[in-house]
A protein has these predicted regions:
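Bacterial N-terminal signal peptides that target proteins for export
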Residues: 1-10
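Bacterial N-terminal signal peptides
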Residues: 9-18
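Sec/Tat signal peptide C-region and signal peptidase I cleavage site
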Residues: 18-24
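Short glycine- and Lys/Arg-enriched binding-loop motifs that mark or flank ligand-binding interfaces
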Residues: 20, 32, 118
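N-terminal edge beta-strand
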Residues: 24-43
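Acidic, low-complexity Ser/Thr/Gly/Pro-rich repeat segments typical of extracellular/periplasmic
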Residues: 39-43, 48, 53-126
């Protein structure tokens, strides 16, 4: 009776410790500007997101909002017009604002799925001075 329990325990531990591609989810590994960074308008001509895996292009959705403006208390978030494109590597997305970003706080939201097809989402903010 001990042998089957030991074998099952060993198999369960091996499965738990083994890396699994199926359990991976798309997530942002880095961004430019970085989350919570303060940058000049010149350095905010594009926003780049780099993910941990190739994305399924039809699942990618991004948004860019201005959430704060100097001197304006309780600023209502405003959508910022932008174009976007996926990198040739399939792991990166570039947002290109149609107009230069003015001083203020911005929020990038994203949703995407990788090979496991689980749609993940996230957001980060940065400030333009």
């Amino acid at each position: 009776m001990r042998k089957p329990i030991f074998s099952l325990s060993l198999a369960a531990m091996a499965m738990a410790l083994a890396p699994s591609v199926a359990m991976a989810h798309a997530k942002v590994m880095s961004s430019t500007p970085a989350a919570n960074a303060t940058v000049s308008s010149a350095k905010a001509k594009s926003i780049n997101l780099v993910f941990n895996e190739k994305l399924l292009a039809p699942t990618v959705k991004t948004d860019l909002l201005m959430t704060g403006m100097p001197g304006m208390k309780d600023h209502t978030p405003m959508k910022v017009a932008f174009g976007s494109m996926m990198g040739k590597d399939g792991k990166s997305v570039m947002l290109m604002p149609k107009k230069a970003l003015t001083a203020g706080t911005y929020k990038v939201t994203w949703a995407a799925a990788g090979s496991d097809t689980h749609r993940m989402n996230g957001e980060f903010s940065f400030t333009v001075k």
